[in-house]
Swiss-Prot record:
Residues at the catalytic site: 532
Listed InterPro entries: Ald1_epimerase_CS, Aldose_1/G6P_1-epimerase, Epimerase_deHydtase, Gal_mutarotase_sf_dom, Galactose_mutarotase-like, GH-type_carb-bd, NAD(P)-bd_dom_sf, UDP_G4E
Cofactor: NAD(+)
Native organism: Schizosaccharomyces pombe (strain 972 / ATCC 24843) (Fission yeast)
Catalytic activity, EC: 5.1.3.2, 5.1.3.3
Lineage start: Eukaryota, Fungi, Dikarya, Ascomycota, Taphrinomycotina
Residues holding NAD(+): 7-38
One GO BP: monosaccharide metabolic process
Region (Galactowaldenase): 1-350
Catalytic reactions on record: UDP-alpha-D-glucose = UDP-alpha-D-galactose; alpha-D-glucose = beta-D-glucose
Protein name per its UniProtKB record: Bifunctional protein gal10
Function, as annotated: Mutarotase converts alpha-aldose to the beta-anomer. It is active on D-glucose, L-arabinose, D-xylose, D-galactose, maltose and lactose.
Listed GO CC annotations: cytosol
Length: 713
């Protein structure tokens, strides 16, 4: 019987501190389930966590007060422990909405603890707050604040945290096998050093540095300093600012501490998580301005209700017992926050971008979403599944074959609509290849003779992580990543592949980058990537007959008629397709045309080359021209004669699959196009540009040369 995986359930795992803690959990070998109702966070943070750790994470959109839904998660998965972040958390807001805070924070926790008790899960790390101490300066000897400082929170937020601490304490008193770690954190700041993850407050930021960051990029006019008449060196309040990564690691240290306790034993203990060093508001202001490179505008206003002079931690207990210590400085935090801010000036709120779940009917699974970038003229939709292009709409006209029902993409008859093809596009002879004296046998998924498009579990049938969505002045990007495991379909080595889509008002560019990661046990593999979109300028559910195609090359790889594999010869096409060629039922293509036949130019990463136009396409009745360009040495032109699925029949679309030579890895002269070793980079770029032109321009295109006609297939 297989051993069931154990999970740490993280409530509020899509939030600022929760998401950073999930990263540290996974980096320390834990499997994680996130539960979050997304009321003051968004799923994009989870997608970015997955991108950073290169692993899929189970996620459930759920309010903790939903006992039935929460219990179902505990029924389904083996939960080993819980890290509890989920809470409303704004001090000022809690003064205005006390009932909402008590209901959400306390009632949600009680429901969680009840479900845990019913499922015999008795390990909880609670993300509390230094606000439970209230104004510690009312005592002469309590700064820095020790855990023994009397508790007297001054606002509803702090009172909910203190109430939850006592609930967990009383639970342990009633059953001493419970293990509760109470982490009283001070002021988290900073962002993940990758620049991919940071605090993204919905609305006006409540915390100092996020607000200051928005001032720095022009989203806010000035910083509001709440009081400069405190008894401090510059009159502003003092706080213990801790880098969010250090804070996240403190939660791992607490969890590890609890896990070392014997199963029959329990404990309840509070720890401060802070640096032990206090900084005033102006200290932080000047540190951040130094990182930005200029002074930022600010205005001193009145004190904020509930604020106190000094909240500096004494972290000695955590240092000694948890073997944890804050290592990162204020400078580190300001640097990481500024990187996050300039790379994500609007956080996760991206103009021209929206997404929705893209699942089989009745299933709610966040690992597959449909991401749409929409400009005035061009709208492109891309799914996590296969990083596939589901729709390309230019001036309201859809130009590619695709399904609105996700389940159809999983049909056996699906001819790879819109998919990213990998790890190796097109055919591999005999389903095998040899490198460094080792023969690798692959999945033979075409007539049990050849490997086609990477095998039965190619990139087209896997869920890519991400995307990282970004906006720029006149374009948007979506970056997806996939980790293809060593041995999948027989291919050696782990492989990390980044697919980056760049969408402008009239173009879709696709960039590929693949590397063998350092952790891979093997150090060589074969790679050839492409996109398998079927284009139809007239109408995606009609035939492409009447479409006019013009290529910049007329040479192709001659193939064996029985195997569809290259003979090794590069020959001229029997009719000149560098002249406009009108498609009709007698003109069919499934051939690899050569853009660059010079072996001296073969390389793994072609991104350094300029894009070359390779194909122009029009339809006489449609005022649109498609131009395909690439850095690649070849492209497969396919007219989709064998397609027959749902509303899409034979010849419902044509493909221009840019890439390397067919079966290049089994040809000594061509193999360096596709053999990737650890430390090297495979890369490629292709672009699909769309132009509006009137029908008279189409006529000129046709008149530029007499178009070909004849039987090509």
């Amino acid at each position: 019987m297989a051993v069931q995986d154990e999970y740490i359930l993280v409530t509020g795992g899509a939030g600022y501190i929760g998401s950073h803690t999930v990263i540290e959990l996974i980096n320390h070998g834990y499997k994680v389930i996130i539960v979050d109702n997304l009321c003051n966070s968004c799923y994009d943070a989870v997608a970015r966590v997955e991108f950073i750790v290169r692993k899929s994470i189970k996620f459930f959109k759920l309010d903790l007060r939903d006992k039935e839904g929460l219990a179902q998660i505990f029924d389904t998965f083996k939960i080993k422990g819980v890290i509890h972040f989920a809470a409303l958390k704004a001090v000022g807001e809690s003064m205005k909405l006390p009932l909402e805070y008590y209901d959400n924070n306390i009632c949600g926790t009680i429901t969680l603890l009840n479900v845990m008790r019913e499922h015999r899960v008795k390990t909880v790390v609670f993300s509390s707050s230094a606000t439970v101490y209230g104004d510690a300066t009312r005592f002469d000897n309590m700064i820095p604040i020790p855990e023994s400082c009397p508790n007297d929170p001054t606002n509803p937020y702090g009172k909910t945290k203190y109430a939850i601490e006592n609930i967990i304490k009383d639970l342990h008193t009633s059953d001493n096998t419970w293990r509760g770690a109470i982490l009283r954190y001070f002021n988290p700041i900073g962002a993940h050093p990758s620049g991919l993850l940071g605090e993204d407050p919905l609305g006006i930021p409540n915390n100092l540095l996020p607000f200051l960051a928005q001032v720095a990029i022009g989203r806010r006019e000035k910083l509001l300093v709440f009081g400069d008449d405190y008894d401090s060196h510059d009159g502003t309040p003092i706080r213990d600012y801790i880098h969010v990564v250090d804070l996240a690691k403190g939660h791992i240290a607490a969890l590890n501490y609890l896990n070392k306790i014997n199963n029959s034993e329990g404990m309840y203990r509070e720890w401060n998580l802070g640096t032990g060093k206090g900084s005033s508001v102006f200290d932080i202001y000047h540190a951040f301005c130094k990182e930005v490179g200029k002074d930022l505008p600010y205005e001193v206003v009145g004190r904020r209700t509930g604020d106190v002079l000094n909240l500096t931690a004494s972290p000695n207990r955590a240092n000694s017992e948890l073997k944890w210590k804050a290592e990162l400085s204020i400078t580190d935090a300001c640097r990481d926050l500024w990187k996050w801010t300039i790379e994500n000036p609007f956080g996760f709120q991206i103009d021209n971008y929206k997404w929705k779940l893209f699942n089989t009917l009745g299933i709610m699974d966040y690992k597959n979403r449909l991401h749409t970038i929409c400009f005035q003229d061009l709208e492109v939709s891309i799914a996590n599944y296969g990083a596939l292009v589901q729709a390309v709409r230019y001036k309201g006209r859809n130009l590619v074959n695709g399904f609105n029902d996700f389940s159809r993409y999983k049909l056996k008859e699906n001819p790879f609509f819109g998919a990213t093809i990998g790890r190796f596009a097109n055919r591999i002879a005999n389903g095998q290849f040899e490198v460094d004296g080792h023969l690798y046998t692959l999945c033979k998924n075409e007539n049990n003779k050849t490997t086609l498009h990477g095998g039965n579990n190619g990139f087209d049938k896997q869920f890519f992580l991400g995307p990282i969505a970004r906006q720029y002045e006149d374009y948007n990007t979506l970056e997806f990543i996939l980790v293809d495991k060593d041995g999948n379909n027989g291919f050696p080595s782990d492989l990390e592949t980044l697919v980056k889509y760049t969408i402008k008002n009239n173009s879709l560019e696709i960039e590929y980058k693949s590397v063998i990661p350092e952790y891979s046990k093997l150090n060589v593999t074969a790679v050839n990537l492409t996109n398998h979109s079927y284009w139809n300028l007239a109408s995606p559910n009609k035939t492409i007959d009447g479409t006019i195609i013009k290529s910049t090359t007329n040479v192709y790889l001659k193939v064996n008629s029985e195997t569809s594999l290259p003979t090794g010869d590069i020959v001229e096409w029997q009719n000149d397709i560098t002249k406009p060629t009108k498609l009709d039922p007698n003109i069919s293509f499934d051939n690899c045309f050569i853009v660059d036949r010079e072996a001296s130019k073969f390389c793994l990463d072609t991104r350094k080359y300029s894009l070359k136009n390779i194909v122009e396409v029009i339809h006489p009745s449609v005022p649109v021209k498609l131009v395909v360009s690439t850095t690649e040495p070849a492209f497969q032109l396919y007219t989709g004669d064998g397609n027959d699925i749902c509303e899409f029949q034979s010849r419902s679309g044509f493909c221009v699959e840019t890439g390397r030579f067919i079966n290049a890895l089994n040809n000594e002269k061509w193999s360096k196009q596709v053999i990737l070793r650890k430390g090297e980079v495979y890369g490629a770029r292709s672009k699909f540009s769309l132009y509006a032109q009137d029908l008279e321009e189409n006529k000129h295109f046709l008149d530029s040369a007499s178009y070909n006609s004849g039987e090509y297939y």
